[in-house]
Amino acid sequence: DFIFPMMQAGAIYEGQYFLGTSIARPLIAKRMVEIARKHRAQAIAHGATGKGNDQVRFELAAAALAPDLEVIAPWRDEDFRNQFPGRKEMIDYCVAKKIPVEASMKKPYSMDRNLLHISFEAGMLEDPWLDASAPRYKGMYKLSVSPEDAPNRPEHVTLDFEKGNCIAVNGKVMSPLKVMQALNRLGGKHG
């Protein structure tokens, strides 16, 4: 419902950036509202920081779908920010409370991952001189492998389309979900 129409529209930000993060927010908000309705909740919450676009995406979608629901945004609460002024404090809290998270002080980046997209963010990753092939960054390859670990041979793939939507990979008819999973596996193993 979201990915294929976005691809058909050629929706790419600044001519190069897939909308993998931004397209997910309305879908997440839609599902949050559905769950809130099912459980007769009066509010929904998101963890978007108060400085990015995600908060706007979540809240506009929620307002359109369920204007009666309160939206709780902890990162806009001063007491919350005083308790957790940065990643270190949040990671320390999670460790103390035995809350499993992938971030650590050695790997202090955040990850956004969904069926279409994966991205990482942290101050050190914004450095254009960063050597992302260094062994310490190998853990960032979640959907793919380092180019050094990818096969040296190309793999030929056929895609079948119907009404602009991919319906088969290598001759095997699949649901949209299975198509995306198959393409992620094929692309991922080639780095």
Model-derived regions: residue spans:
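Nucleotide-activated chemistry modules centered on ATP-dependent adenylation/adenylyltransferase
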Residues: 1-191
